Amino acid sequence: MKIPFNPIINEYNQLETDINEAVINCLKSGWYVLGKHVETFETKFAKAMNTPYCIGVASGVDAITLILMGLGISKGDDVIVPAFTAFPSITGIQRAGATPVLVDVCSKTGLLDPTKIEKAITKDTKAILAVHLYGQCCDLTHM
């Protein structure tokens, strides 16, 4: 049996016209990096998040790295992260100079288990990187 890694064709089919139009407009503009499309995204996203600022980045690794650096997290600091996660979570922590501390997940959800976080916290712990998976949100209230 062959199981597709991340079949997003159904989502694409629902948005095909909008996606194709946006890509063509971007290509015709000649701006593939930064430019008005990114500015528009940043402005709209900041407004949607009710915050004055937004910076578009190239990847999730870049986003995690910049967030941690912006929080002053660096060498000597630990960041708790679920053991079941994609590599960008770990890479972002390492690029910020911190050490990832892998914590086991809940066997029913695959999400970070709040009951196991407390045991992993040390004097060097500066952050917990919660990873939401498969349409499920982590129990942030108990973290």
Model-derived regions, located:
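PLP-dependent aminotransferase class I/II
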Residues: I9, V38-T43, A48-C54, T115, ...
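PLP-dependent aminotransferase-like
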Residues: M69-M143
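Short alpha-helical
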Residues: N10, Q14, T40, D62, ...
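Solvent-exposed, non-membrane alpha-helical residues enriched in polar/charged side chains
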Residues: N20, I24, K28, E42-A46, ...
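Phosphate-binding glycine-rich loop
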Residues: W31-D78, G92-A96, L102-D104
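N-terminal "arm"/small-domain region of PLP-dependent enzymes with the aminotransferase-like
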Residues: M1-S29
